[in-house]
């Protein structure tokens, strides 16, 4: 048979511990690489054997004696506070996870929010509802903005190449991929990112407050059949997407009128 390694019980520090130890380990390896000087013929030994062995020993000891107890204490405290706060705690959690999910669309903050959300969901502390809704709201909202901008303002508020990308972003959103909205954030972060976050926060929190629940750790069409109160869940997505679209259109129009936004498709 095949031997598989697994923990006998979940590591209590979860994502928080992993984040701390990964940062510390990275700086440790950098420091050791600078301080440990060996002859040239031993450089390969240093980089492929010595540094990995020393850093692995350090990580093992630090995790066992420091990070796991400390991270577990922090993680346990967060869970206790959220659980004790009841519905208010669940709504605060939903707002925080939604904001972190929408702010950088698959970037490091988004991934951190995902690890936290999946950790809480795996341990059946809080569902992953807000996280999953916040993934799809920005791209749907941005795609919608490229459709309604001219109808609302009488002007095209995006450069020509962004219009087809808006439709692509909407399609990818239904696959659970938020990165389709990244080109809009790169082109004008001051109009896109706040709109993503506000739409995601309002839509996700509204759905959670009205009783939508998702425990399955996926997003979009892959998870929708398993959602409790799917109608409320979809209404939250629609609400968030509309808010995102209207905010983007309004902010871009204001910037255009102030001469701070150049548009090649007018």
Question: Predicted regions span which residues?
Answer:
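Pore-lining transmembrane helices
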Residues: 1-40, 47-263
């Amino acid at each position: 048979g095949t031997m598989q390694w697994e923990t006998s019980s979940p590591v209590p520090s979860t994502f928080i511990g992993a984040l701390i130890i990964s940062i510390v380990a990275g700086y440790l390896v950098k420091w050791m690489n600078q301080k440990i000087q060996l002859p040239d013929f031993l450089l390969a030994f240093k980089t492929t054997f010595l540094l990995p062995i020393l850093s692995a020993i350090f990580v093992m000891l630090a995790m066992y004696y420091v990070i796991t107890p400390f991270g577990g204490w922090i993680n346990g405290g967060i869970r206790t506070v959220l659980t004790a706060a009841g519905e208010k705690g669940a709504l605060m959690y939903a707002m925080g996870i939604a904001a972190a999910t929408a702010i950088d669309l698959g970037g490091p903050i988004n991934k951190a929010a995902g690890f936290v959300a999946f950790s809480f969901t795996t341990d059946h502390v809080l569902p992953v509802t807000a996280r999953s809704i916040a993934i799809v709201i920005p791209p749907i909202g941005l795609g919608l903005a490229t459709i309604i901008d001219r109808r609302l303002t009488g002007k095209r508020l995006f450069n020509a190449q962004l219009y087809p990308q808006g439709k692509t972003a909407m399609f990818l959103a239904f696959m659970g991929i938020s990165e389709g909205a990244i080109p809009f954030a790169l082109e004008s972060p001051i109009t896109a990112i706040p709109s993503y976050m506000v739409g995601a926060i309002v839509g996700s929190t509204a759905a959670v407050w009205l009783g939508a629940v998702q425990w399955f750790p996926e997003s979009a069409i892959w998870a929708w059949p398993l959602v409790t109160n799917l109608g409320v869940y979809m209404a939250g997505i629609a609400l968030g997407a509309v808010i995102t679209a209207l905010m983007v259109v309004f902010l871009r129009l204001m910037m255009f009128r102030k001469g701070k936004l150049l548009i090649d498709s007018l």
